[in-house]
């Protein structure tokens, strides 16, 4: 639900930056939230548990799932070079440009709080001491892991190359009478909200 709030804020900010940020976050949300759901499913399938209190230490048994969770977690928090950063960056700038720096600050605080619950899940499920009756846990089958890998690739690709999503979005902005952003494969190239995702590293 919290991620939907970013989209609403982006639309409320208005302008090309706001609408582009909101639509980009919608796309990114599909990648990282669906990946998180699949990770939960993989953990439940492998452990036959549905409570965090009954887990612990399964990262040693499920390293692929742990890696997928790291990508999804960084993306939902908005850490570069994942996709969540690219859309949240635009939303922060859209709010500032709309004269709402306080809302931009609150949005940033929201990302910090998101980090808290991601860290809680990470520690409760994957880190710590493994439960003694989880010794036979192993990775989920390929039918679960392959979609996880595809979604994780989307989280990274739209983070490193946000133009993959922004270029089509830019076309939509023009259809609604908004001035398109100066967008390239690596991000917004000039003006408010400009950043070069590939140049950051």
What does each model-identified segment do?
Residues 94, 164-195:
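Membrane-interfacial helical/loop segments at transmembrane boundaries in membrane proteins
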């Amino acid at each position: 639900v919290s991620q939907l709030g970013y989209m609403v804020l982006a639309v409320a900010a208005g302008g090309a930056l706001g609408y582009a940020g909101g639509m980009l976050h919608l796309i990114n949300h599909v990648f990282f939230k669906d990946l998180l759901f699949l990770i939960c499913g993989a953990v439940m399938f492998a452990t036959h548990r549905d409570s965090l209190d009954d887990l612990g230490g399964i990262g040693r048994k499920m390293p692929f799932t742990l890696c997928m969770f790291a990508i999804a977690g960084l993306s939902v928090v908005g850490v570069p070079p994942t996709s969540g950063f690219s859309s949240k960056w635009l939303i922060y700038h859209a709010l500032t440009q709309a004269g709402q720096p306080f809302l931009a600050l609150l949005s940033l605080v929201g990302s910090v709080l998101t980090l808290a619950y991601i860290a809680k899940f990470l520690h409760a499920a994957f880190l710590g001491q493994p439960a003694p009756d989880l010794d036979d846990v192993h990775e989920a089958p390929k039918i679960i892991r392959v979609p996880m890998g595809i979604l994780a690739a989307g989280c990274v690709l739209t983070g490193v190359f946000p133009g993959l999503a922004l270029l089509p979005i830019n076309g939509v902005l023009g259809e609604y009478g908004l001035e398109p952003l100066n967008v390239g494969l690596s991000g917004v190239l000039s003006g408010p909200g400009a950043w070069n995702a590939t140049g950051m590293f």
